[in-house]
Each structure stands twice: as C-alpha cells, then as structure tokens.
Amino acid sequence: MEIRKPGLGAYITATYPNKVLFLNAVKCLSEVSDFLEVGIPTLNPKYDGPVIRKTHFAAELKGLDAINVARYGIIPTILMGYIEDYANRLELVAQVASEVGASSVLFPDLLFEHIDRLEDYVVTMRNYGLRPSFFVASNTPHRLVNLLVKYEPLFMYLGLYAATGIKLPLYIERNIREVRRLVDGTTLVAGFAINSPEMVRLVINAGADAVVVGTALVDKLGNGEECRRFMMELRGGLA
C-alpha cells in the first residue's frame, strides 16, 4: 500500500492517553489522513520532543502490548519505535506489525546508532511482507542515502529538528531539496513543526511528498471533531 502524494500523515502514540481514546483517534484519523504513524510506547523516547515524550510516559500500555489493541490497514500504517528496545527481537516486531495490518516499521535510531543491523532489518521486514522505511537527516552521508534507495523503501523520513510554532528556516527548505535530489523517485516524508496549512504547503513545495503532524495533534486527540477539523484545515495546504 503506497503513500498518497501529496500526502498528510498523523502521528499518535499507541494507547495514549488511554486505550479507548486511542482507538477513537485511530478511527477518526484513518478517515482524514493519508497514512498513520503509530508510536510504540517506550521508557526512553530519546529522539522525540518534550510533548511526544510525555505521551510515551503516559500511555496506558507499553511496548508491543500497546500496538496490539488495534487493527490498522484502512490507510498505510507505519509503526515507529526504537531498535535499541528490540535489537534481539526484530522478528517479533515484524510479526506483530504484520498481524495488526501495518505496512512498515520505522526505527529512527537504526542508521545513527545501529547501522550494523541494517541488513537484518531489511531482510526481516521483507520476510514478513513489510516494506523497510528509513529515518535520515540532512547530514546522512550521500552514499548511504543512495544505498537505502536501492532497498526500495516505503518512504524516507527526513528529520529536520525544528520546534512547533517557529517559522521554518530557509536552510530546512534547502535540506529538503538536497535530499529530494538524492532519493529521486522514492517517497520523501518530512515531519517537524507542522501546525498550519501554510507550513504544509511550504514543505511540499520544497520537495517533500508528504508531511506528518504529531505534536500539534496531542491536545486534540480527546475530541474527535476538533481532531478532524484540524486535519482538514492542514489538508488545505496540499492543494
């Protein structure tokens, strides 16, 4: 299942703030998003910002138990976790992902701290009928990006480390264009500081195929209509 281009995705942490509201959010977001990223709650969300970090700590369940409460697949769904939590249990993660209807598992720390597991990760994803996905940064070596493209990933996620609510710096637009050139036709997703249709439009115009909103969604997850309205407002930036 491919990601729509241009696309709007939503990130939510599994079972935050509780199972019932999480399941309601999955249903709502599946109707107004092009894809979902579902965070696997961890005690060490080291690459997440302060708001998302709190959702990991407050989630009703932790680890794969939190993922198992729902079934996905109405739209492409990507599980997002840290490979350090599952370094010796990659097959278990892939099995759970496949069983709940996910398309891929994204590990932001794979390339930065566990590059030696790259081949294991790709093989395991494929063995369970999943597509690999990769988290890259603007300083990821070009030769590595070129290698990743050859694995035919579901997408490349470009991390840009900006804070919600600040104006997008010009250098970030430049970084998107540079990575766009490197990944060629591979789907490029960017997620950072997305809280308005203007920011969505800017990121898409810079060369991303899709954007993900996470932090700006957190305080809206308990209200289905508010969540829906916000996502539809952001979708205006794709036009």
Report each predicted region and the residues it spans:
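Extended, intrinsically disordered, low-complexity segments
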Residues: 230-239
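Ordered, amphipathic secondary-structure segments that act as subunit-interaction surfaces
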Residues: 76-93
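N-terminal amphipathic alpha-helix/helix-capping segment at the start of soluble metabolic enzymes
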Residues: 1-13, 69-72, 177, 239
